[in-house]
C-alpha cells in the first residue's frame, strides 16, 4: 500500500498546489546574494494561503513589543489585458472578455533594498513593475514596455516595465510591484511576514507564541531549509505546458481559451480509472503509474466509480480551498489528477 501511495503522489505533487505551496515561499534563500537582510537574524512566518488579519495584527503587536522590524510579502493573480511598446503600439492583446493571468508579488518599497539590488529597489519606488525572465520570454516583453493590467478589484492600470530579472531573484513569481501599486491593483493579502533583528533570542519566539493565537503556522529561523514541496511555479508551468487566456465564470470556475484547450486537452480510456480528460503530456506518466498499480495487484485500492463522479484531471478553475489570491489550479492545465477524493479508500491522491 505504501508503494502505491508514494508512486501516484509523485505524479500529482509535482504540479499540484499544496497548502503551503506558493511562489516566493523561499524568499530569504533566493535573495542571499544581495547586501541587506543576510546581515540580520531573520524569522519568517507563513500559513496556508494567506496570513489571517488577526495573525498579521498579532505579529505587529509582537514586533512592537520586541523592538524588531517586520515587513509583509503580498501575492495575488492579476489580469494582463494588453502590452504596449515604447511607441504605444500594441504588441499583445487578448480576446474580448479574456485575460492572461500573472502571479504578482508585492513588497514594501522602503524595505526592498534589503532583498533586491539598489536598481530594482529604486524602480519599485518609481512605481514600475519588475518582470521575470521566463515571463518576458512568454509574452515577448522588454524593459520600457507598458502592461495594461486588470486588478483583483477590476481596476485597470498601466505600468511600465522597469527591469527584467532572473526568476530565482524575483522568488519565482511572474512580476513584482511595490505595496502601494499592489493596493491599487487590489492585492491586499499577505502570504508571509519577515521579521529581523540584530540578534534573535528565545524572547522573540516566546513573544510570538504568546500573542499569536492561531498555531497552524510555518515559522523558519536563520538558515532553516525551505519547504521542498516539488511544486512547479506558474512561470515554469507556462514554460512547459503553454499559457492560455481565461474568461471568468463565477469567481471559481473559468473558461480556458478554446484554441489552447483544443490543442492540449484530450479524453482517453485508461486502465483502472476509466475515461479521463487530461493534458496530452500526462498520458505516458499516468499510464505508467496505473500499469505499476496493476502489476503490484493494488488496483482494488482505487475507485473507478469515485474517480468518474468526484475525481478527475482537467478542471478549469481557481484554487478555492483557502484564500489563494485568484491562483489558477494546475487542473486548469490538465496536469493534476485526483483519485479517491471522497471515500474511505486509502490512499487519497
Q: What is each PLM-predicted segment?
A:
Residues 4-20:
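Sec-dependent N-terminal signal peptides of Gram-positive bacterial secreted proteins and lipoproteins
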Residues 17-40:
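Alpha-helical transmembrane segments
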Residues 36-41, 51-70, 75-223:
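Basic-flanked hydrophobic alpha-helices used for secretion and membrane insertion
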Residues 48, 125-126, 268-280, 325-326, ...:
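Second-shell loop/turn segments in exported
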Residues 139, 151, 290-297, 343:
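Sec/Tat-exported extracytoplasmic proteins
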Residues 236, 240-306:
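Active-site acidic/histidine clusters and adjacent loop/turn architecture
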Residues 302-320:
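Acidic helix-start/capping segments at beta-turn-to-alpha-helix junctions
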Residues 315-343:
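Short, surface-exposed glycine/acidic/tryptophan-bearing loops
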Amino acid at each position: 500500500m505504501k508503494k502505491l501511495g508514494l508512486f501516484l503522489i509523485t505524479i500529482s505533487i509535482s504540479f499540484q498546489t499544496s497548502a503551503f505551496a506558493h511562489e516566493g515561499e523561499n524568499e530569504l534563500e533566493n535573495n542571499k546574494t544581495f547586501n541587506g537582510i543576510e546581515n540580520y537574524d531573520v524569522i519568517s512566518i507563513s500559513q496556508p494561503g494567506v496570513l489571517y488579519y488577526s495573525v498579521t495584527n498579532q505579529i505587529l503587536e509582537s514586533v512592537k513589543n520586541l523592538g524588531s522590524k517586520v515587513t509583509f510579502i503580498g501575492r495575488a493573480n492579476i489580469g494582463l489585458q494588453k502590452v504596449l511598446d515604447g511607441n504605444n503600439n500594441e504588441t499583445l492583446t487578448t480576446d474580448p472578455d479574456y485575460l492572461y493571468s500573472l502571479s504578482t508579488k508585492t513588497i514594501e518599497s522602503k524595505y526592498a533594498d534589503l532583498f533586491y539590488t539598489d536598481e530594482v529597489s529604486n524602480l519599485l519606488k518609481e512605481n514600475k513593475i519588475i518582470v521575470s525572465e521566463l515571463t518576458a520570454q512568454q509574452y515577448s516583453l522588454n524593459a520600457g514596455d507598458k502592461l495594461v493590467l486588470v486588478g483583483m478589484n477590476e481596476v485597470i492600470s498601466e505600468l511600465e516595465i522597469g527591469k527584467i530579472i532572473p526568476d530565482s531573484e524575483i522568488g519565482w513569481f511572474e512580476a513584482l510591484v511595490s505595496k502601494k501599486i499592489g493596493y491599487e491593483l487590489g492585492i491586499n493579502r499577505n502570504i508571509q511576514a519577515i521579521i529581523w533583528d540584530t540578534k534573535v533570542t528565545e524572547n522573540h519566539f516566546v513573544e510570538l507564541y504568546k500573542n499569536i493565537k492561531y498555531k497552524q503556522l510555518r515559522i523558519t529561523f536563520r538558515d532553516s531549509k525551505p519547504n521542498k514541496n516539488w511544486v512547479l511555479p506558474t512561470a515554469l508551468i507556462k514554460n512547459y505546458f503553454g499559457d492560455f487566456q481565461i474568461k471568468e465564470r463565477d469567481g471559481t470556475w473559468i473558461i480556458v481559451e478554446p484554441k489552447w484547450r483544443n490543442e492540449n486537452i484530450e479524453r482517453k480510456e485508461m486502465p483502472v480509472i476509466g475515461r479521463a480528460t487530461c493534458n496530452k503530456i500526462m498520458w505516458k506518466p499516468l499510464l505508467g503509474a496505473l500499469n505499476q498499480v496493476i502489476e503490484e495487484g493494488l488496483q482494488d485500492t482505487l475507485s473507478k466509480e469515485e474517480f468518474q463522479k468526484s475525481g478527475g484531471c482537467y478542471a478549469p478553475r481557481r484554487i478555492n480551498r483557502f484564500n489563494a489570491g485568484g491562483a489558477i489550479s494546475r487542473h486548469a492545465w490538465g496536469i493534476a489528477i485526483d483519485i479517491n477524493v471522497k471515500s474511505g479508500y486509502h490512499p487519497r491522491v
